[in-house]
Amino acid sequence: RSEQIIGTMWDEIPRNDIFIATKVGWDMGPHNHWYHPEHMRVNMERSLKNLKTDCVDLMYLHHCNFGKQEQYFDDAVETIRRFQAEGKTRFIGLSDWSSDKVMNFIERVDPDVIQPYRNVMDDTYASTGLKDYVEANNLGICFFSPIKHGLLTGKYTEPATFETGDFRKTVKDFADQKLIDKMKTNKSKLEERFANHPQPVMHGLVDALLTDAPTGCVLLGQRNVEQVEAAAQLGEALSNEDGDWVNGLYKG
């Protein structure tokens, strides 16, 4: 649905003004694993049709689940490289929740961009060696879940319950009153520290991730105009001092 919405924009916004990323490997289709070449092509062609474009800018391997013996790895990489050779994508990316998994495959995939899980509470970017690899190879880096599904913003006052199928239902921290109280306290501290910024809480949470990532960006889910306008005010990396201070709030 999101791709279809984006595909309606090209009469008003030039396609070349927008950098589009999509992914393959997010559903198995009729197969018993994530990276069957035929279904990767089905997903790729569906995305191009939805987006009303002949080529995306970036196409990710959505995760590093290539089979217990990595038996689907070669086909996955060969297929996405074929898409690139066919002019269906300009760049190739690799993503996973685990930076350790990314590190296990990064040299063999040889991606242009990495998309790891990272926020100021859950951060293995440096400790796994991913940061050093990204810098040594001048890769793009796009961090996902930067506000941990909203939990880090301090907007929750008590344990939350979610409907079946909502991913947040699997995040145990939403049931931790002590942690929720800490997030509320941290929210107040961010508002005080960055009072001169129009989005003080988001500035602290999001822009701290850019302090040590000069080739980086942060992926924020945006469901309404207000969230888009807030996101547009972010993206300036914190100073080392401010970044260390923010990280100390959530790791202390």
Predicted regions and their residues:
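Short, acidic/polar
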Residues: 35-52, 97-104
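Solvent-exposed, non-membrane alpha-helical residues enriched in polar/charged side chains
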Residues: 7, 11, 41, 45-48, ...
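Active-site-proximal beta-strand/loop segments in catalytic clefts of secreted hydrolases
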Residues: 23-25, 146-147
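Beta/alpha (TIM)-barrel catalytic core signal, keyed to glycine-rich beta->alpha loops juxtaposed to Asp/Glu
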Residues: 9, 64-252
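N-terminal binding-site loop/beta-alpha segment at the start of enzyme catalytic domains
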Residues: 1-18
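Active-site groove signature of glycoside hydrolases
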Residues: 48-67
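Short acidic capping loops at alpha-helix termini that bridge into adjacent secondary structure
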Residues: 15-18, 22, 54-58, 90-91, ...
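Active-site mouth loops of central-metabolism enzymes
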Residues: 24-41, 67-71
